[in-house]
Amino acid sequence: MQARLLIPILFSVFILSACGTLTGIPSHGGGKRFAVEQELVAASARAAVKDMDLQALHGRKVALYIATMGDQGSGSLTGGRYSIDALIRGEYINSPAVRTDYTYPRYETTAETTSGGLTGLTTSLSTLNAPALSRTQSDGSGSKSSLGLNIGGMGDYRNETLTTNPRDTAFLSHLVQTVFFLRGIDVVSPANADTDVFINIDVFGTIRNRTEMHLYNAETLKAQTKLEYFAVDRTNKKLLIKPKTNAFEAAYKENYALWMGPYKVSKGIKPTEGLMVDFSDIRPYGNHTGNSAPSVEADNNHEGYGYSNEAVRQHRQGQP
């Protein structure tokens, strides 16, 4: 009775292997972000900005300078997600015995010769090279069986890197301004500010992982935001906030069994490891702070190099 119940269960498991719900990770559909990815990217950015310690800026007028690493791109993952034929790969062939009989035609040749009163008679028997009859007989039955495991592997990932998405940069800027406003800190134009706050967004992207085992499978999408910030008093050029790093990771995970499911979907956010290199240990030469704070606003002649206006002016005038 148990054996009869076990057979249809095993049959159903093998038939339903690789059947489930596919969620585009990281994206399917012409490069457009889908809702889960948007949620993760926004969550990691919100957490990183919300965790900024801004107490030293209370009562000050702040000018914000935000620089973002290029993050926009597109990618596709092909292959992977194995299907089970069986747990092993092999083949067994049982071939029947085959016997073939050939019948070759034979012909007789007689030659008579006479010379000087003597007569000779020669008789020869020859066999043709081509058979006149062929008969093939097979004894026994033949069979062929095979077992196998077809694995698509981890898949092939192809990506394309583009420039920074201006909408992502604007979104980050709005998040920062929102947090400053809710903390009671005034964000003003650079001309009216007494404090400069610099925020460098080093990491702002997604990570996709796939786990493939015989019984357990998982799809994971992670979004990370890592930033470093500091604040400078314009009057005395002192650091109100020394360089600090915030790093958060939001994750979405689908769990499968034999690629059936997902039977469990989980989401979460947590702090992650910081930047590989930060500026928290940098000190000014001779315990002296420069006359001008770094600037991320570049004119047409030095665009993209991050020089301050004072440094550019000195360079043009030939000053050291």
From Swiss-Prot:
Positions of region (Disordered): 288-320
Coiled-coil residue spans: none
Localization in the cell: Cell outer membrane
Keyword Lipoprotein: yes
A GO biological process held by the record: cell adhesion
Top-level taxon in the UniProt lineage: Bacteria
GO CC terms, sorted: cell outer membrane
Sites of S-diacylglycerol cysteine lipidation: 19
Topology in the lipid bilayer: Lipid-anchor
Residues carrying lipid (N-palmitoyl cysteine): 19
Key words, A-Z: Cell adhesion, Cell outer membrane, Lipoprotein, Membrane, Palmitate, Signal, Virulence
Main location: membrane
Signal peptide start and end residues: 1-18
Similarity comment: family membership: Belongs to the MafA family.
Protein name: Adhesin MafA 3
Organism: Neisseria meningitidis serogroup C (strain 053442)
Name of the coding gene: mafA3
